[in-house]
A protein has these predicted regions:
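Metallo-beta-lactamase
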Residues: 5, 41-43, 61-73, 100-156, 160-224, ...
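Metal-dependent catalytic neighborhoods of phosphoester/phosphodiester hydrolases
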Residues: 75-85, 103, 235
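Active-site/pore-lining binding-face segments in mid-to-C-terminal subdomains
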Residues: 206, 211-268
Length: 311
């Protein structure tokens, strides 16, 4: 079981999303009111439960399960995990709550994208009883310990149903996907590398930029990424994502003007990414490449979707 101790209070459990290590993680905040941030998809729930067991935590002790947004790789397992955590309440953005109570649209949308792979990747998606859902919105707080009151920020850009969570004790921020993706596979090579996540179908570049700049202004000490792990250099990480975001939008606009496919746009995006990795000394083939290729494909789809809606 892959568990990383990030500090005295926060542990990261690898959910092996898509069968990949260091893809999507669940954060465990060891406060008086034990809190989990992100469940991952349903196939990750067994990994989360095993991780809690190894940490000496019983499922009865879990008080809050928070999902930053309702995309299935972050929240698909919420209903399944909640079934085994009898004392837990699920915390979600107001625009996401009804879709977790009645996930039929989430399921239909994912089936349309993933087809025959849906069952292996996401099943089962269990509805969350409405009485076990609590909504948090901009400026709301959640007291989870005598000295810890989590603060919720509305952080659109990746999705409209997205919030981030400020942890005052570590001066850290749980970014979900709004501040992009951290490629943990490159850390062993001494390389900090981040890309934006511009996936469909609610990507909004201006909102994403504003959310990231708000994080920058907070002078944080750590960022906790949904994909994947903790960055101890928040300003540099956020600046990197903003620079790539500008380039992604430029390339997306050009691809849309030329009526290119998502595959063609993904290749456009891959060229500067590969060039920068080569500059940083990354030798190919590298185990990070399947992650990056997958992310660029999804980001290309979101960029084209955005420009179609603007026309």
């Amino acid at each position: 079981m892959a568990i990383s101790k990030l500090n005295d209070r926060i542990q990261l459990i690898d959910g092996f999303d898509l069968g990949l290590e260091q893809r999507t993680g669940s954060y465990v905040i060891m406060e008086q009111q034990l809190t989990i941030i992100e469940t991952g998809p349903s196939p990750s729930v067994e990994h989360v439960k095993q991780g809690l067991k190894e940490l000496g935590i019983s499922l009865d002790e879990v008080r809050y399960i928070i999902v930053t947004h309702i995309h299935l790789d972050h929240a698909g397992g919420a209903g399944l995990l909640l079934q085994d955590c009898p004392n837990a309440t699920l915390i979600v953005h107001p625009k996401g709550a009804r879709h977790l109570a009645n996930p039929s649209r989430l399921i239909a949308g994912a089936r349309a994208v993933y087809g025959d792979k849906f069952d292996d990747l996401f099943n089962p998606i269990v509805p969350v009883p409405e009485h076990r859902i609590a909504i948090k919105t901009e400026g709301d707080r959640l007291q989870i310990g005598p000295d810890c009151s989590l603060e919720f920020w509305d952080t659109p850009g990746h999705a409209k149903h997205h919030f981030g969570i400020l942890d005052p004790v570590s001066n850290g921020f749980f970014v979900g996907d709004t501040a992009g993706i951290r490629y943990a596979q490159l850390i062993e090579d001494g390389i900090d590398f981040y890309l934006p996540s511009t996936s469909p179908n609610q990507f909004d570049p201006e909102a994403m930029k504003a959310s990231i700049e708000r994080m920058e202004s907070q002078q944080l000490d750590v960022l906790y990424f949904g994909h994947y792990g903790a960055a101890m250099n928040p300003q540099a990480a956020l600046r990197q994502v903003l620079e790539w975001l500008e380039l992604f939008v430029e390339e997306g606009a050009a691809a849309y003007r030329h009526d290119e496919s998502a595959d063609q746009l993904a290749k456009r995006l891959a060229a500067p990414v590969m060039a920068q990795l080569a500059e940083k000394g990354v030798k190919q083939p590298h185990r990070v490449m399947p992650y990056i290729e997958m992310d660029l494909q999804v980001s290309a789809q979101g960029l084209l979707d955005y420009f179609r809606k603007q026309s």
